């Protein structure tokens, strides 16, 4: 039968999606299912790994039922996932020994503090390109092994398996036959040497984690195994692509050359710049990460993570009740010609790149009696653009590459005011992608390359299309004046201590 589709499984922090793409990279069907978030203590975030798989299976079933396609027309499956989230399970039974600890969770902060005090930060940064932070998988693995009954003994005997969510999904889809991850996900674990391309024995010793629990690390585009579940009507479909969500979005945006960058405007912002086959060490508060591994070669990226972006709009809507729908924010911002001197620094959970200060909290500056709701909303939207410039400035300094354009996706950038202001503050064109689901598209592309569904990256570049291009309209003097005000507001925020 002719292969007409690639299936992408996009497993995110709050929901799972199954999306079908055709040969032109167009969406032909989609299903989505949310699952329960677990908050055992303040700052802790967990998922039931079984709930994740149930949501994956449900979306596959709904998609196939809704589209009525012949399963045999699916050439392959690509998987993209919330990164860093950690699962450990029993190899024999397939049962998790504890909940999945989510990337957002801060429950391993004490472990990070102890390792930093012990002097391990430089070792971690040199080998992994990351920081000693609870964000990454390594300390989550240690926490589970330390707290689950008899876990260290079982792990040492090789009875347990660790995986990020991609690994957990593939294990289940293949009936427990395949225990793998890809370079992009391995590079986010705090245990993988991104230069030597191996699980690092020094880092494993530091964390007291036995190598026996680790998955094989493979390229981001190859056939890892075949499905062995009833959800595909008994058909064995190749699982052929893996990438962490932000790297998948970089691939889906066709950022294939050094200096090309994308920014995803979701709850937070994740900006990645392709740096080619060279791992660029950041001296400006960014992360060095593996973008993907293809055709025997590794390509790298610089990443800046902004903790609060689109969620500032949710705060205005739900917390302050300034408007009824998130989309109303654009109309409020457009009613005033400027921010009225108001700056919102949305450090609700601290500041991410390039500051990395988890101890600071949000602040608002410049309020007067003439400040209106419209000024406040505009200032909150502007904060996303300022934070993106903070990250871009660090990227350009680290990579010594001048950005020519910024490719964007995510819900917040559908706001035309936000997109135009972003272009003005960066002084570069902002290109909004025609397809919003660039993360899933990236996973589909990787699977399509491995199965021959697509022939080359050049073919994918031809498929990439712009919804709209926003070009800078602000003069340099005004741009720098506004950004100077932001830097002053951030400096004041960093200096404030909560009693």
From Swiss-Prot:
Q: Which Pfam families match?
A: FGGY_C, FGGY_N
Chain residues that bind sn-glycerol 3-phosphate:
13, 83-84, 135, 245
Q: Which CDD domains match?
A: FGGY_EcGK_like
Q: In which pathway does it act?
A: Polyol metabolism; glycerol degradation via glycerol kinase pathway; sn-glycerol 3-phosphate from glycerol: step 1/1
Q: Which InterPro entries match?
A: ATPase_NBD (IPR043129), Carb_kinase_FGGY (IPR000577), Carb_kinase_FGGY_CS (IPR018483), FGGY_C (IPR018485), FGGY_N (IPR018484), Glycerol_kin (IPR005999)
Activity regulation description: Inhibited by fructose 1,6-bisphosphate (FBP).
Kindly state which reaction or reactions the protein catalyses.
glycerol + ATP = sn-glycerol 3-phosphate + ADP + H(+)
GO BP: any one term = glycerol catabolic process
Top-rank taxon: Bacteria
Similarity comment text for this entry: Belongs to the FGGY kinase family.
Task: Supply the name of the protein.
Answer: Glycerol kinase
């Amino acid at each position: 039968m002719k292969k007409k589709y690639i299936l992408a499984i996009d497993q995110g922090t709050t929901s799972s999606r199954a999306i079908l793409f055709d040969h032109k990279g167009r969406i032909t069907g989609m299903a989505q299912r949310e699952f329960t978030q677990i908050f055992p203590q303040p700052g802790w975030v967990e998922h039931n790994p079984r709930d994740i798989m149930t949501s994956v299976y449900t979306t596959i079933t709904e998609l196939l039922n809704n589209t009525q396609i012949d399963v045999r027309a699916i050439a392959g499956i690509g998987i993209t996932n919330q990164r860093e989230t950690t699962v450990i399970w029993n190899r024999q039974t397939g049962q998790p020994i504890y909940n999945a600890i989510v990337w957002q969770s801060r429950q391993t902060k004490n472990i990070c503090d102890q390792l930093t005090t012990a002097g391990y930060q430089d070792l971690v940064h040199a080998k992994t390109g990351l920081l000693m932070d609870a964000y990454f998988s390594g300390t989550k693995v240690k926490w589970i092994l330390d707290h689950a009954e008899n876990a260290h003994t079982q792990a040492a005997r090789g009875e347990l398996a660790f995986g990020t969510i991609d690994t957990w999904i593939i294990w289940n889809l293949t009936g427990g036959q395949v225990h793998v991850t890809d370079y992009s996900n391995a590079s986010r674990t705090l245990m993988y040497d991104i230069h030597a391309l191996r699980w690092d024995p020094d880092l494993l010793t530091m964390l007291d984690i036995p190598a026996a629990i680790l998955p094989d690390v493979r390229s981001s585009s190859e056939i890892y195994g075949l499905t062995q579940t009833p959800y595909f009507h008994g058909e064995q479909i190749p699982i052929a692509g893996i990438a962490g969500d932000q790297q998948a979005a970089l691939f889906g945006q066709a950022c294939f050359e050094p200096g090309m960058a994308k920014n995803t405007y979701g709850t937070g912002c994740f900006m990645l710049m392709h740096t080619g086959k060279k791992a660029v060490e950041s001296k400006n508060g960014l992360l060095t990460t593996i973008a993907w591994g293809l055709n025997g070669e590794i390509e790298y990226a610089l990443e800046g993570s902004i903790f609060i972006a689109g969620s500032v709009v949710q705060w205005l809507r739900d917390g302050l009740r300034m408007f009824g729908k998130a989309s109303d924010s654009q109309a409020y911002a457009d009613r005033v010609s400027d921010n009225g001197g108001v700056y919102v620094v949305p450090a609700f959970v601290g500041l991410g790149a390039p500051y990395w200060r988890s101890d600071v909290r949000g602040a608002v500056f410049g309020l007067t009696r003439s400040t209106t709701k419209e000024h406040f909303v505009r200032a909150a939207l502007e904060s996303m653009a300022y934070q993106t410039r903070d990250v871009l400035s660090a990227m350009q300094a680290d990579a010594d590459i001048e950005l020519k354009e910024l490719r964007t996706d995510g819900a917040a950038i559908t706001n035309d005011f936000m997109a135009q202001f972003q272009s003005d503050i960066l002084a570069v064109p902002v290109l909004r992608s025609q397809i919003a689901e660039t993360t899933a598209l990236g996973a589909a592309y990787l699977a399509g390359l491995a199965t021959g569904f697509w022939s080359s990256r050049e073919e994918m570049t031809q498929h990439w299309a712009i919804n709209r291009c926003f070009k800078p309209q602000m003069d340099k003097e005004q741009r720098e004046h506004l950004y100077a005000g932001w830097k002053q507001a951030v400096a004041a925020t960093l200096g404030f201590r909560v009693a």
